[in-house]
Amino acid sequence: MIPSSLIAMAAFFLDTVLGDPQSRWHPVAVLGRFIGRLDRLLYPTNGSNQRKFAMGALLTLLVLCISYAFAEGVLLTAHQLPVTWGADLVSMILLYFCISPRTLAKAGQDIYALLVKGDLAAAREHVGYIVGRDTAQLDEADAARAAIETVAENTVDGVIAPLFFFAFGGAPLAVLYRAANTMDSMLGYKNERYLYFGRMAARVDDVLNFVPARITGGLFVMAAFLLGYDGRNALNILVRDAAGHPSPNGGHAEAPVAGALHIRLGGVNYYFGERHFRAYMGDAHMEISAKHILGTIRLMYTATVLFLLLYYLFSLYY
């Protein structure tokens, strides 16, 4: 048996080299279509709010159970292979499909390149691929801020959280987490359709991300020190501002990044033409620019490597 920490490192290396395959048969894409079908099947169009919540909870339970059982079944099958490392290889592949640091980095790098090139219209279009806010009126600083916030916050659910659950429950638990996070991204909206129907999916995602988000905050502070950013300020802003984020977990990723880079995140966003204000994270010592996107990506990768190293060291003694 290969230590699980080394399997996690191998999955991260594979993602770094290959990235996330863009295919309709990618397991997460297949999972998304499955969730979409259950959404259409179980949503009670004329039901009460209580019924919508109950059916949404049923959908959430079904997806979590089926996802976990699928991963467990694949691993049990792999254990029957004539090679001793078969199950380890399958675990690595499953985890590889659950993490997406390279995809996250590329999304930020694409926006950075367009902003540096001066193509604000294309940068706005690319920002629209990764956020739900209106992008038509974004200036350069707003486009960069959207990219920074996305990379920072998604370091939790796209990298650290899957690794965390893999460390504690192997590939099946990492797959279960990815299923929960995918449901939240599809159903966790506060609109007429999903306010009640998607509430359980959103709450499950919040609960699962609670510990990984706080670990990510600490890792960002450590990464800031290692990279020569302002680690002390990252810690100060994490403590001061994280709780102000509308998400119970998002601030623990965004606040230390803002502090490390001496920028201010949050503020005014527009959704479907309506103005929304989100609490500020950090202080505006510097105007946000494209270069801060690259700084956030460096923090993301360094935090990931730190997690893997700590995971390996912990596995040596426990």
Task: For every predicted segment, state its role.
Residues 1-176, 180, 188-318:
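Hydrophobic alpha-helical transmembrane segments
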